[in-house]
Amino acid sequence: MTYISDQKKIRKKILELTHKSNSAHVASNLSIVDILLVIYKNFVKKKNKNEFILSKGHACLSYYVILNFFGYISDKKLKTFGKNNTELMSHISHKVPGVVFSTGSLGHGLPFSV
């Protein structure tokens, strides 16, 4: 698959889940798809334990979709976004496979990662 087709699939899934959950910051989520895709395709590897921290926690849906795309979370789990009693909350939760640190307010990620 090409990068363009991958990012289109990811954006489509973000829009579908935003609509179904009746929540999420659409612009914030769509604006970081390219960045997340490049980082996960080229730098983050499961075996090497390279880690990524998303400080922009309100853009969690794009992060969850990327984690799904790269096999960290299942389609079934992804569909629980925005539902009651789910790990996939509207801000990043460290309880989600592939997530290192819970974030919400802008700027939390930088001091934690240092």
Which stretches of residues belong to each language-model region?
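N-terminal hydrophobic or amphipathic helices/low-complexity stretches enriched
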Residues: M1-I10
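Cofactor-binding active-site loop characterized by glycine-rich and histidine/acidic residues
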Residues: I14, K20, A24, N29-V114
